[in-house]
């Protein structure tokens, strides 16, 4: 049997975001509960959000490895330019019916870019001069440098030269 062990880290950022762009995905080959050493394993991508590399940056070709004394084999996954889930399939070389797929590996969008930021208000020039507490809604749209929506929970800070505004808020994806 082939079993998925881990993806470390479970989240990497899109290429060029200036943060971690590589994860190691590990599988284990077992005979019952005993680990099998020196077994050839072939890795392939089954879900690729765009540009993800297997074994090296940008390569989508299958990669082979041999299990160690613990029955484990691993492969490096490199982020591409699009965010989304990634799945790696590990199969026993010579018997494609014995396989497992990775879980919980994600390529996340990068930090926001000023180039892809917009700010809008529900009401311009509110009656704030002689009326206290007149509200308006501010909407901020953010994307990373490739135009991908930023992750939920990205914090936006506000300042005001006149009047009052909440000091910060966290993003929430709205379709």
Task: Please give the residue ranges for each predicted region.
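The feature marks long extracellular or luminal low-complexity segments
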Residues: 1-175
């Amino acid at each position: 049997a082939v079993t998925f062990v881990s993806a470390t880290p479970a989240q990497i950022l899109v290429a060029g975001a200036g943060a971690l762009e590589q994860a190691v995905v590990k599988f284990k080959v077992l005979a019952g509960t005993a680990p099998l050493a020196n077994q050839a394993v072939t890795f392939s991508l089954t879900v690729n959000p765009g540009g993800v590399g297997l074994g090296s940056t940008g390569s989508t070709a299958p990669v082979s490895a041999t299990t160690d004394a613990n029955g484990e084999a691993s492969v490096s996954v490199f982020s591409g330019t699009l965010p989304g889930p990634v799945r790696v399939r590990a199969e026993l070389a010579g018997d494609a019916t014995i396989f497992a797929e990775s879980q919980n590996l994600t390529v996340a969008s990068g930090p926001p870019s000023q180039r892809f930021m917009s700010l809008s208000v529900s009401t311009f020039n509110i009656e704030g001069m002689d009326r206290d507490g007149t509200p308006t809604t501010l909407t901020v749209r953010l994307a990373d440098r490739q135009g991908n929506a930023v992750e939920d929970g990205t914090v936006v800070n506000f300042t005001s030269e006149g009047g009052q505004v909440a000091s910060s808020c966290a993003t929430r994806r709205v379709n």
